[in-house]
């Protein structure tokens, strides 16, 4: 028996507009869109046990999601960047847990949400310290929101304000042969949301 899971027709606009007030002040508007499809294993109706009380289950009804992004960017002195951004993702999917009603098991399955919405502001500041240290600092603040009205007899509308600090560094250890450089990068995020989850601090140094 065949059935149609989805049948839609959608525009995916992509555009970049730039206005140069003078070489010291540049304003740019970026609009982009895309479509993301689930993997084969995400839609395969197969049950994979994690332990005696948890399983991973495929979702044959999982739909691809569309993403629409917009950025308004101001570039000062062809060096410093200030931006405002917004990302809207209808039908966004993520792996979420729910309680099986027929047996004592947690089921982890990819589910389509109503939407994911993020918007915020950021600033990018590059700088140098002599010939030894070249760095770029990114600071941003945003509001994250994910919503699903029908989730196994439940619903959620999870939202959170978050901040992010990111720093990319290149240290020149030797300019003569051999030319040695060291890259040291790191970020810190105050938190995030994913479906019913309220995630704590995230960080990484590499």
Residue ranges and their predicted role:
Residues 1-3, 31-37, 46-47, 78, ...:
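Transmembrane beta-strands of outer-membrane beta-barrel pores
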Residues 6, 23, 35-84, 88-90, ...:
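Outer-membrane beta-barrel signature, preferentially recognizing the C-terminal barrel domain
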Residues 15-19, 70-76, 121-127, 165-173, ...:
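Residues on the lipid-exposed face of transmembrane beta-strands in outer-membrane beta-barrel proteins
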Residues 63, 82-143, 147-168:
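Outer membrane beta-barrel strand-and-loop segments of large Gram-negative receptors
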Residues 1-25:
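Signature of Gram-negative outer-membrane beta-barrel scaffolds
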